[in-house]
Design a protein with these regions (language model features):
Chain B
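Short helical segment in ABC ATPase nucleotide-binding domains corresponding to the A-loop/adjacent helical element
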Residues: 92-100, 110, 114, 218
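Conserved signature/switch motifs of ABC ATPase nucleotide-binding domains
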Residues: 128-131, 149
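Catalytic Walker B motif of ABC-type/P-loop ATPase nucleotide-binding domains
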Residues: 154-157
Length: 336, 257, 254, 254, 257
C-alpha cells in the first residue's frame, strides 16, 4: 500500500505543498492531554490553515473510546496509546495505523511516571521499596501496564509481590492518594505537578530509568484518511510536524517566543496556569515524527504474553511512517 | 307501537372454564314513550341487559330490535351509574360530547348544549371540571348529555344510586320534568322500589341469576307524581309491599346459593 | 395533624434552612479541614469559581450547549416514546410485541450503550442527543402505555356508546386520559436526561456541562467540577418545577 | 375488546416471537454484513463466546461478584431510604427538612459522583456498593414518603378511633399502607442498581459484569462485551420478575 | 340516665380567610341504651358532630360529656361510611383490630372476634381480604369490629349509604338483632327517613348550615320492626311525610344559597 501512495505522491510532486483547492476538514480525536501539543500549535499558529485544512477537535474520555470512532471514519486522526485493544481491533480488520510520535518521556523529567504518596515519600525512596505496595495503573494491557511491568523488572520485584490497582481515571488516582487507598501511581502531567503542589504525592524517581525509549502515545490515522485523502494527509502531517517543532524549540531548546506556545497550550489543555508550564515535565515529541518502533513491538509482545491479544497480525502494516517521510522530504529534517 | 322488542334473549359469560348464565330467555316489548323500570336482586343481569341494548355487549342467543323512526337520530344513549362523566372535559364539553361525536354543526351543538345545561340548572357551572361538582351535579351532566344527544331510546343504569335520598328526589323530579317534555322511551334500572313507583309506567321484576322477567306491573298513578302522593296512596303501598316481598325472596335465594 | 395559622410559615422556614444548614456545615468542615479541602473545596470557593467562570464567558456557552442537547435529546426520546406507548396501550398486539423488547433493552446501562451509539450515530451532536433520547425513551413509553391501559373502562364505554370514531376516540379519550400517568413518565424522563448528560458528553464533546464535569475532574480542578455538579443540580430542580407547572396547565381537571 | 378462547395463545406467541424476530434480524444483518460485524457480531457468535466464557469458569465468578455488589448495595440503599421515607411521610418537619436535600442531590449523575465516592469510601468493595446504594436511595425514599402521604386519611382516623399507639400505628397502618407505592420505588431502584453496576465497577474493580463490559470494550473484544450486556439484560428481567413475585406475596390484599 | 350530654356545642372551620360555621349551639342529651338517628341535609354538620364525639375533631365552644360506666371499656367506636375496613388486614384481623390495639389477651381477642364473625355471618370468610368482599360484607366487618370492641357508645356515619336497597335492609335487620342483644347507646347518621323509622327510638332533625337541632321525634313503634310493618302503619306514614316536608324545605334552603 505504501508504494502505491508513493506513486500517488510522485504524480503530484510538481507543487507538493500548495494549499488545497478546496478546504478540507480533518477531525482530530483528543482527550485534552498535553501530548496533543502539535495539533494545538499547528492550529492556532495557522499551519493547517496555510494548507487550507480546517481542523476540528472531538474530545473523548480516553484513547480506547476513540477507536470505534476512528474505525467508523468519524474521525480522521486520533491521539492514542499502544494497547491490546488497538492490536485487537486491527486483527478484527479495523485498519488503523500509527503514523507519528505523540509522546515519549524526556530523560530525567518524564511526563508519564510513577508518583509516591506524600506521607510515604521518605519510606519509599528506591525501587526495592515498592515491594508490598498498592500501585494504581490506569489501564490493563496497555502502555501503562507495560511501563509498570518494566519498573517492576527494574526493581527486581515480581508481580505477585505488589498489588496492582486498576483505576480508570488519573483523577481517581489523586482522590485515592488523598484517601490513602494507594501508595504509588503511574501518573501523568500536569497532574504530577499539580499533586506535588497540593502535597498529594511526589515524583518517584523517573520512568526513563527503566523504560528510556517507551513509546507512550502515537498519532493514529484512519485508513480512509491515509489512502483516499492522501493529499490532505501529507499536508496535515507537514503542518503537524511544524507545530511539534515550535513546541520543541520552546520547551527543549528554550528559545523564547514571548510565551506564545505556552499560552496556546494553556488554552487547549486543562493546565490553565501559564507559570506552571515552566515547572511541569513536558511531553517529549519527536520533531521528526519518528516513533520508537522496537519499543512498540516490545509492548506488543508483552500484551501477547499476557494473553490479551487475539489473532495474529502483520506488524509492518501497523506502523506506517510513510506519511512522516513524505512530509520530511518536503519540510526537511529538524536538526537538534 | 312497539319501540323495543327483545326475543328469546340469553347471555352467557365465559370465565376461565366456567359459564355464567347471566340472562335467560328474555322476551319483552316496550312501547314508544314508555318509562319502564327494571328491578331485580344484585347480579341478576340488569346491567348486562342494558349493555346489550346499548350494543356494548353481544347477546349469546336471541334478538334485540330497536325500532328506528328517524334515521338522523342515534338509536340509544346511556346514562351510567356513576363516573360516567368524563373528568377531563368541562361540564359543557361533557354535555356536548354526543353531539360532537356526531360532528353536527357548531351552532346546533351550542344551542342544544345550552338548552340542556339550562334544563338541569348547570349554566353557571359550564366551565367547571367534574372534580369540582357534587355527585348530584355530575349525574345532572350525565342526564343532560344523554338527552342532548336526542336518541330514540334512553338507557339508564341506576343513575341515582350513589346520591343521598334528598338529592335523589330532586333529580328524580328534574328527570321527570325533562322526560314529560320529550316523551322518550326510557329503560331505567334501579334497586329502589320507591324510585320505580315514582318514575315508571311499568315495573319489570327480574329473578336472581340467571335473570328472567318474573313480574310485569303497570303503574297507573296519574302524573305529575310526588313522593308525598306515592306514600299516601294505599294502592301504591300495596304494590310496594307486593314487589318488596317478591324481591326479598329472590334476594334470599341468591344468598343461599 | 392539626394546622394552626401561625405554624404555617415554619415548614417553609425549614425547607429553606435545610440546604443552607448543609452548606454551612460543609463550609465549616472545609475551612477547618475536617473535610479535606483539596477534595471538598469550601462552598464559598466554589461560588467564587462559578462567578469567575461566568465572567470569563464560556460558562454560558457550556450551559447553552448542554441545554440544547438535553432539550432536543429529550424531545427525540419523548415523541417516539409517546407514540409507541399509545399504540401499546391501545392495541394489545403492539403491547405484546414491544414489551419484551423494552424489557430487554431497558436494563442496559447508558454507559455500555455509548460504543454502540458511537458506531451507529457517530460523534456529532446527534449522537449525544440520541444517548439522552434512548435513556428517556423507556420510562416515557412504559408510563404512556400504562396510562392508556389504566383509563377507566367506563370512559371507553361512554365513547363507544356515543359512537366516537377512531380519531375522536384517540384525541378525546385515549390521549387526555393517559396524560396524567404519561406526564409522570415524562417527569422521570427529564430526571434521567439530566443524569445522562455526563455520559452523553463523553463521546467527542468539546463543551457542555457534562464535559465541564469530567474534563475538570480529569484535570483535577475540583472547584470547577463542583460548579458543573451545581449546575446539573440546579437545572434538575428547575426542570422539575417547570414540568410541574406545565402539568398543572395541562391537567386543569386533576 | 372481545376475547375468544382460540386467540388467547396468540399474545403469548407474539411475546415470545418478538425477541426471536429481533435476534434473527440481527443474525442475518450481521452474517450478510448489512451491519458491520466487527461492531455487531452475530448473536450466534456471541452465544459461542458466552459458552466459552462459561466453560473457562471465571464468568460465574464475575456474575457472583457483581450480584453480591448489586444485592448488598441495593440493601444498603433501600434500608435507609425506607426509614427516611417513612419519617418523611409521617412527620412533616422531616419532610420539609429532607425534601430539598433530596431534590438537590437527586439530579447529580452517578458518573459524576464517582470521584466523591472514591474520596469518601475508597476503592474497595464498599465503595462499589455505596455507588449502587446512592443511586437506589432516591427513588425508594421518594416513593416511600409518597406512599405514606397517600394512605387514605380514613385509615388514620380508624387507627385513632381505636386508640392505636405509636408503635401499632407504625406497624399496622403506616408500613403496610405505604407498601404498594414503596414497592414501586423498590422496583425502580432495582432497575437503577443494574444500570449503575457498570459505573460502580469503574472504580478499582478487577471483576464483575460491569468490569467485563468496559474492560472488554477497552480491549475491543466486542463479543465478550455483548456477553456482559446480555447478562445485565437477563438479570434485569430476572430481578423484575423476582420482585413482582415478591410483591404478590407481600401484598396479598392488592 | 343520660349517656351523652352535649351542651352549647359549636364548631367553626377555618378555610383560608373564611370561617365555616358547621355546628351552632347544639344542646342534646341521649339516654343510656337509646338508638338515635340523626337526619339532615347534606353538609349540615352531621359528620362533624360525630367526629367531635369520636374525639377526631375538637369543638370550638361548648362541652361534650360521655358518661363512662366501666373504666375498662373504650368510650366509643365508630363505623365509617365506607372504606373504613383496612384493606391490608383480613376480615378476622379487621374485626380484631380494636381489641388488638387495646392489647388484650390473645384468647379473649380470639373468642370475641369469633363471636362477632359468627354474628355477622362471616366465619367462612375470615381469611379473605376486603377486596374480595362485596360492599355489604365490608360493612358487616365494620359493624362487627365496632361491636367487638365493646364500647360505651357506638357512632355510625351512614354505614349503609353505599349499599343497594335490598342489601341495606338485610344489614339493617342484622344490626337491629345485634343491638337488641347488647342494648348499646347508638348515634346513627342517615339520609334515609325509612331507615331512621325502622331503626331508631328517636329521630333528630338538623337544619341546613349552620347545623342546629330543629326537630326531635320519638318513634314509639314496637320492636321487632320490619319494613312491611313500617310501611303499612299509617302513623309511620304520617311521621315520614312530616319529616320529609321539613327536610325538603331545609334542602331547598341550601340550594338557594
Ligand atoms: N364481562 C363479564 N365477564 C364475566 N361475567 C360477567 C361479566 N359481566 C357481568 N358478569 C356476570 O354476569 C352476572 C350479571 O351481572 P350484571 O352486572 O348484569 O348484574 P346487575 O343486575 O347489573 O347487578 P347489580 O345490581 O349489582 O348492578 C353477574 O354474575 C356478573 O358476575
Ligand atoms: N376539615 C374541614 N375543614 C373545613 N371545612 C370542613 C371540614 N370538615 C367539614 N367541613 C365543612 O363543614 C360542613 C359540615 O360538614 P359535614 O361533613 O359534617 O356535613 P354532613 O352533614 O356530614 O354532610 P353529608 O350528609 O354530605 O355527609 C360542610 O360545609 C363542610 O364543607
Ligand atoms: Mg348493574
Ligand atoms: Mg357526612
Amino acid at each position: 500500500q505504501s508504494s502505491e501512495s508513493d506513486e500517488n505522491d510522485n504524480a503530484k510532486s510538481t507543487d507538493p505543498l500548495a494549499p488545497l483547492e478546496e478546504t478540507a476538514k480533518v477531525v482530530i480525536a483528543e482527550d485534552g492531554s498535553a501530548s496533543g501539543a502539535g495539533f494545538y500549535i499547528a492550529k492556532d499558529k495557522g499551519y493547517f490553515e496555510k494548507y487550507n485544512i480546517e481542523v476540528e477537535f472531538a474530545t473523548f474520555g480516553n484513547s480506547d473510546e476513540m477507536l470505534p470512532a476512528v474505525a467508523a471514519g468519524e474521525v480522521d486522526v486520533a491521539g492514542g496509546i499502544s494497547s491490546a485493544s488497538f492490536f485487537n481491533s486491527i486483527a478484527q480488520g479495523i485498519d488503523v495505523r500509527f503514523i507519528a510520535d505523540k509522546g515519549h518521556n524526556n530523560e530525567g523529567s518524564s511526563y508519564f511516571t510513577f508518583v509516591v504518596r506524600e506521607d510515604l515519600k521518605d519510606d519509599i525512596t528506591d525501587y526495592e521499596d515498592v515491594k508490598g505496595k498498592k500501585i494504581a495503573v490506569s489501564t490493563q494491557n496497555a502502555v501503562d501496564h507495560y511501563i509498570y511491568n518494566e519498573m517492576l523488572k527494574h526493581a527486581n520485584v515480581s508481580t505477585e509481590e505488589v498489588e496492582f490497582v486498576l483505576m480508570s481515571d488519573f483523577g481517581n488516582m489523586m482522590s485515592a492518594m488523598g484517601n490513602q487507598q494507594i501508595d504509588l501511581a503511574l501518573q501523568i502531567e500536569p497532574l504530577i505537578t499539580q499533586g506535588e503542589n497540593q502535597a498529594i504525592h511526589q515524583r518517584f524517581l523517573d520512568a526513563t530509568d527503566y523504560a528510556p525509549e517507551a513509546q507512550i502515545a502515537m498519532v493514529l490515522g484512519s485508513p480512509k484518511f491515509l489512502t483516499e485523502r492522501r493529499d490532505v494527509a501529507v499536508r496535515f502531517m507537514a503542518a503537524y510536524l511544524q507545530g511539534v517543532r515550535d513546541y520543541h524549540d520552546v520547551f527543549i531548546k528554550d528559545i523564547d517566543d514571548n510565551g506564545e506556545v505556552i499560552s496556546i497550550m494553556a488554552n487547549h489543555t486543562a493546565l490553565k496556569d501559564e507559570d506552571l508550564w515552566k515547572e511541569v515535565g513536558v511531553t517529549g515529541l519527536n520533531p521528526n515524527g519518528y516513533i520508537f518502533e522496537d519499543d512498540v513491538e516490545k509492548q506488543y509482545q508483552f500484551y501477547k504474553e499476557n494473553g490479551a491479544i487475539q489473532g495474529e497480525l502483520d506488524f509492518d502494516t501497523i506502523i506506517d511512517m510513510s506519511l512522516v517521510e513524505e512530509a520530511l522530504d518536503i519540510i526537511g529534517t529538524y536538526e537538534e | 307501537m312497539s319501540k323495543i322488542q327483545i326475543e328469546q334473549l340469553s347471555k352467557r359469560f365465559v370465565k376461565r372454564d366456567k359459564y355464567i348464565e347471566a340472562l335467560k330467555d328474555i322476551t319483552l316489548t316496550i312501547k314508544q314513550g314508555e318509562f319502564v323500570c327494571l328491578l331485580g336482586p344484585s347480579g341478576c343481569g340488569k346491567t348486562t341487559l342494558l349493555r346489550i341494548l346499548a350494543n356494548l355487549e353481544k347477546p349469546s342467543t336471541g334478538d334485540v330490535i330497536i325500532n328506528q323512526t328517524d334515521k338522523k337520530k342515534p338509536l340509544q344513549s346511556m346514562v351510567f351509574q356513576e363516573n360516567g362523566v368524563i373528568p377531563w372535559l368541562t361540564v359543557e364539553e361533557n354535555v356536548a360530547f354526543g353531539l360532537k361525536m356526531r360532528h353536527l354543526s357548531n351552532d346546533f351543538v351550542k344551542e342544544r348544549t345550552e338548552y340542556y345545561l339550562q334544563k338541569v340548572g348547570l349554566s353557571k357551572f359550564r366551565r367547571l371540571y367534574p372534580k369540582e361538582l357534587s355527585g348530584g351535579m355530575k349525574q345532572r351532566v350525565s342526564i343532560a348529555r344523554a338527552f342532548a344527544n336526542d336518541p330514540e331510546i334512553l338507557l339508564m343504569d341506576e343513575p341515582f344510586a350513589a346520591l343521598d335520598e334528598q338529592n335523589k328526589f330532586i333529580l328524580q323530579e328534574e328527570l321527570l320534568a325533562i322526560w314529560q317534555e320529550t316523551r322518550k322511551t326510557v329503560l331505567f334500572i334501579t334497586h329502589s322500589i320507591d324510585e320505580a313507583l315514582l318514575l315508571s309506567d311499568r315495573i319489570l321484576l327480574m329473578s336472581a341469576q340467571p335473570g328472567k322477567i318474573i313480574k310485569d306491573v303497570a303503574i297507573e298513578m296519574n302524573r305529575p307524581r310526588s313522593i308525598e302522593k306515592v306514600r299516601s296512596d294505599p294502592e301504591m303501598t300495596k304494590i310496594f309491599l307486593d314487589i318488596w316481598e317478591q324481591l326479598q325472596s329472590e334476594v334470599k335465594q341468591t344468598r343461599l346459593k | 395533624m392539626f394546622k394552626k395559622l401561625k405554624t404555617q410559615s415554619l415548614p417553609q422556614l425549614i425547607t429553606i434552612s435545610s440546604p443552607i444548614f448543609l452548606l454551612l456545615l460543609w463550609e465549616i468542615c472545609s475551612q477547618y479541614a475536617l473535610l479535606d479541602p483539596r477534595f471538598f473545596p469550601a462552598p464559598t470557593l466554589i461560588l467564587t469559581t462559578l462567578i469567575q467562570m461566568a465572567e470569563s464567558g464560556n460558562l454560558f456557552e457550556h450551559i447553552y450547549i448542554s441545554l440544547t442537547r438535553i432539550i432536543l435529546g429529550f424531545a427525540l426520546g419523548v415523541i417516539p416514546a409517546i407514540c409507541i406507548g399509545l399504540l401499546m396501550g391501545m392495541y394489545k398486539y403492539f403491547r405484546h410485541f414491544f414489551s419484551p423488547i423494552i424489557m430487554i433493552f431497558m436494563p442496559i446501562p447508558t454507559l455500555a450503550m455509548l460504543p454502540i451509539i458511537l458506531i451507529l450515530f457517530g460523534i456529532g451532536e446527534f449522537s449525544k442527543m440520541i444517548t439522552i433520547a434512548i435513556s428517556v425513551f423507556f420510562p416515557v413509553a412504559i408510563n404512556t402505555a400504562a396510562g392508556v391501559a389504566n383509563i377507566d373502562r367506563i370512559y371507553l364505554d361512554v365513547a363507544k356508546n356515543y359512537h366516537a370514531n377512531a380519531k375522536d376516540f384517540f384525541f378525546k379519550i385515549a390521549l387526555p386520559g393517559s396524560l396524567p400517568v404519561m406526564l409522570e413518565g415524562i417527569q422521570m424522563g427529564q430526571a434521567i436526561a439530566l443524569l445522562t448528560i455526563v455520559a452523553a458528553e463523553m463521546i467527542g464533546a468539546t463543551s457542555g456541562i457534562g464535559y465541564l464535569i469530567w474534563m475538570n475532574y480529569k484535570a483535577f480542578l475540583l472547584p470547577q467540577m463542583y460548579v458543573g455538579l451545581i449546575l446539573i443540580s440546579f437545572f434538575g430542580y428547575f426542570f422539575s418545577l417547570l414540568l410541574r407547572g406545565f402539568e398543572r396547565k395541562l391537567l386543569p381537571w386533576k
